[in-house]
């Protein structure tokens, strides 16, 4: 059975550079039909997304594997955001996962077992690893201050860095950059991101002075930093619950 910390069984979808999904090019008739229906449909959930940040994430079971992520968020209320995660901000970006972000208050209401799955955001913001593309720091700073006190739970559904041409296997839990050996983002990844977006992480760092993390950093979050243990999912066969026998 599939596991998030094992390479999937070899197949056409598991070999390649992961840049282009498998499948034929979209037909002109299909594209025209979709444009027409998009004009008639509300797309309300998607139109609620008003936040875009770019950062990096590490695999919980293998922090040495690090990826650039673009997070598009919908603020449900002051304490909760729900986000779609992509591998870039281009029109051909891959949807690679989802992240939920909660305030310190909501996080502290969770059970310790649940808290193990969540990560903090203060370090990546203070180190300017998390940026708001095209938004001036002065405008972004109030939101960055809020995010620095928050916690996130990010499930990666498409391991593009592995070269997968389709989403394979089960989701992987992701963790945020941290000031420990395996949690420090590789310089070449930061350099590539900066060049693509015309920014300088080093130049942004001074503007992050005064941004603080949670009032009382929860020791269960960022579980791997303290306990040196990550989390991986396994798919296991199980008996189905049913109220009547199968025909």
From Swiss-Prot:
InterPro entries: OBAP-like (IPR010686). Transmembrane segments: none annotated. Residues 1-28 are annotated as: Disordered. Belongs to the OBAP family. PANTHER family: OIL BODY-ASSOCIATED PROTEIN 2B, PTHR31360. This is Oil body-associated protein 2B. It comes from Arabidopsis thaliana. The lineage of its organism: Eukaryota, Viridiplantae, Streptophyta, Embryophyta, Tracheophyta.
